[in-house]
Amino acid sequence: MGPWSRSLSALLLLLQVSSWLCQEPEPCHPGFDAESYTFTVPRRHLERGRVLGRVNFEDCTGRQRTAYFSLDTRFKVGTDGVITVKRPLRFHNPQIHFLVYAWDSTYRKFSTKVTLNTVGHHHRPPPHQASVSGIQAELLTFPNSSPGLRRQKRDWVIPPISCPENEKGPFPKNLVQIKSNKDKEGKVFYSITGQGADTPPVGVFIIERETGWLKVTEPLDRERIATYTLFSHAVSSNGNAVEDPMEILITVTDQNDNKPEFTQEVFKGSVMEGALPGTSVMEVTATDADDDVNTYNAAIAYTILSQDPELPDKNMFTINRNTGVISVVTTGLDRESFPTYTLVVQAADLQGEGLSTTATAVITVTDTNDNPPIFNPTTYKGQVPENEANVVITTLKVTDADAPNTPAWEAVYTILNDDGGQFVVTTNPVNNDGILKTAKGLDFEAKQQYILHVAVTNVVPFEVSLTTSTATVTVDVLDVNEAPIFVPPEKRVEVSEDFGVGQEITSYTAQEPDTFMEQKITYRIWRDTANWLEINPDTGAISTRAELDREDFEHVKNSTYTALIIATDNGSPVATGTGTLLLILSDVNDNAPIPEPRTIFFCERNPKPQVINIIDADLPPNTSPFTAELTHGASANWTIQYNDPTQESIILKPKMALEVGDYKINLKLMDNQNKDQVTTLEVSVCDCEGAAGVCRKAQPVEAGLQIPAILGILGGILALLILILLLLLFLRRRAVVKEPLLPPEDDTRDNVYYYDEEGGGEEDQDFDLSQLHRGLDARPEVTRNDVAPTLMSVPRYLPRPANPDEIGNFIDENLKAADTDPTAPPYDSLLVFDYEGSGSEAASLSSLNSSESDKDQDYDYLNEWGNRFKKLADMYGGGEDD
């Protein structure tokens, strides 16, 4: 047999209850798999969303979804063929018939009839549905073709195999035997693939390799996997496929092994107190994992098992058996009596006859405004100082039986007899108290006591007819010392700016509002920026203390000068009132016109005329038109002309070519009232050409040293100081060789030097006053040249007195100054005398022989020295005394 003949002998699936013959599949034809469908419903009342059954349409394109349509608007057919109820439905007849339509890929229309039977009316399974009570058969063959279902050639087409869940075994258990007609030609081996075979969960289904028996190895769970799709394979002994793979669909049928589960353990809802019967409160929901399409294992019914409290009636609420909506069934809900209800709700499958579970529903009765706020107490008293706003007078207390912090509890206060709006009541959000305050200042002199009537309500209106509570509040106004009041608060006075100094301008007084007090008012000026005014402290009369000036633009704005006046009473405490005085200063012609600018530049070549503005600080008519005139010979070189009809500016230009330099021009300006003034213009002629804008005067050289010169001088001084410092350091480092003060022992010189004359008698009583008078000048001229003298302050020596009687005091004071003078002789330091003096009559002492000499000393020459050395000659010469 050739390859084409072998492929035409397709696999035959033999499902053997008896010997069915294999037949070759026919071409696929679109259509419903049954001409009619019959579904059974449990009762005559169906809720919205109830699943009735499923129809199936084959369009031969392999699509999983199909568009269905029904003329009966009570039902909905999904794209998967599931028929559901669109709205609540009640059966008036035991049967309902309607048609379901579908279209194939060529838009041909097909229809099937659907019949709904209530329980008890010919109740039997629909003929097109496979049994779910167990395994259909051990052996099956290809079913005969029908107008509603056509098989494509070369395909294995078998109905789904149903297998109940939760079977007890023993396992493995046979499901169906698969046979190929090729087993007559040779040995055929069978295998399966797909979910449950070689993909997770692996090993749920197995097939005997040689016999083709498909078996299940363990209990199935529909809630885990509802459908298994397997593919069977047939191969020869050499491993070659003898048939194409065949799809096997295994459907797990449901058992009621799952009880309903509420979506929440505790459901919470609320209802207004006093709600009418039929008012929906809340909805509870439960789910069931069992099949809710083909069985009633997931058909849940709701009931209320208990209610706590059972007051005022044990059945205050009811629940919709199918939807779980809880509603009010009787009147009497009162939040103040029973604020909450707790219901135990049950959900049971099999329409309430199967497995069940419970949950709790907590219903809160919300408040309505059925209790009015009541004042407690109903009378109040308070005091408030006059003239003070936003002052708390008293606190109003109310009680309300409604729920706190709700609109039915929040109080709203209203003053019934406050036409002037002088009081206000606000609500404390914490305790609902009313705070009575003044909205504006009260006047003790106008009214000393107020009696107010206050009513209280709630934010929301009363739900029932209730009486509004009211309270009476007595408010006493306390008198306080009030500040004097200026009348008017702002006073305008017109005065000429040339008003005489010391004259009274006006009188600005204040009134005392405290009519029950006798007080004295004192006036003074609080602000007078120009220091022009003074006031009589008793009468309030205001006069000038200096000349007024309207053109003082620092203090006068828009011809108005502002001063602040205060009035102080002598009450306790002292009160002060303020008034504003506005002096409107009228203008006088006290300012002559002036030119602007006063410094002007011209170019030497081709100069352009310059415009000069004329400015007058006065007001019209004391201003323009102005008159301009060149004076003091300025018209010889310059000319002016008016620039505008109002003569508020002039044009200045030279008459001839001028040399570069500075010029002074005298310009006389006069206003409309003949007030004139001569002003000197500074004119500079620059070395340039054209308009004045391009003319720039050379910058003068600044007098004195410039910064670079100053820096150079400072640098030179610094360099000189550094040089001197280096020289001093060099001199200090040089080794100073000094002669010893005493000769060494081996260098004895027997020379005698004459150091002045020692004779002459006692001279300590003969002093020269000029030496004392000279002070520091009396120091010897012999100074050290090896030690720099220390700079110290010079002591103060008294001058020689004219009176001889004071000479003693003069000597004592100057002696004290000399004793503390470190620069006065004698100096406490060794002095090196480079010059010993000349013209001494005595020979040098170095000629004397030392007493340590070995030879005899000859001292006879001492006799030749005169009387001053006679004593010495007698001592050493051996001569006798006279």
UniProtKB/Swiss-Prot annotation:
Induction: Induced in the hours following cyclic mechanical strain in keratinocytes. Expression is repressed by MACROD1. Changing residue 193 to P: In a diffuse gastric cancer sample. It holds the Pfam family Cadherin_pro. Ca(2+) 3 binds at residue 288. Expressed in granuloma macrophages (at protein level). Expressed in the skin (at protein level). Expressed in the liver. Residues 755-767 have a biased composition (Acidic residues). Residues 1-22 form the signal peptide. GO terms for cellular component: actin cytoskeleton; adherens junction; apical junction complex; catenin complex; cell junction; cytoplasm; cytoplasmic side of plasma membrane; desmosome. Ca(2+) 1 binds at residue 257. It is a single-pass type I membrane protein. Residues 23-154 form a propeptide. Changing residue 838 to G: In an ovarian carcinoma sample; somatic mutation; loss of heterozygosity. GO terms for biological process: adherens junction organization; calcium-dependent cell-cell adhesion via plasma membrane cell adhesion molecules; cell migration; cell morphogenesis; cell-cell adhesion; cell-cell adhesion mediated by cadherin; cell-cell junction assembly; cellular response to indole-3-methanol. Changing residue 711 to V: Detected in an endometrial cancer sample. One of its GO terms (molecular function) is protein tyrosine kinase binding. InterPro entries: Cadherin, Cadherin-like_dom, Cadherin-like_sf, Cadherin_CS, Cadherin_pro_dom, Cadherin_Y-type_LIR, Catenin-bd_sf. Gene3D superfamilies: Cadherins, TCF3-CBD (Catenin binding domain). The modification Phosphotyrosine is found at residues 753-755. It is linked to Diffuse gastric and lobular breast cancer syndrome: A cancer predisposition syndrome with increased susceptibility to diffuse gastric cancer. Diffuse gastric cancer is a malignant disease characterized by poorly differentiated infiltrating lesions resulting in thickening of the stomach. Malignant tumors start in the stomach, can spread to the esophagus or the small intestine, and can extend through the stomach wall to nearby lymph nodes and organs. It also can metastasize to other parts of the body. Endometrial cancer: A malignancy of endometrium, the mucous lining of the uterus. Most endometrial cancers are adenocarcinomas, cancers that begin in cells that make and release mucus and other fluids. This is Cadherin-1.
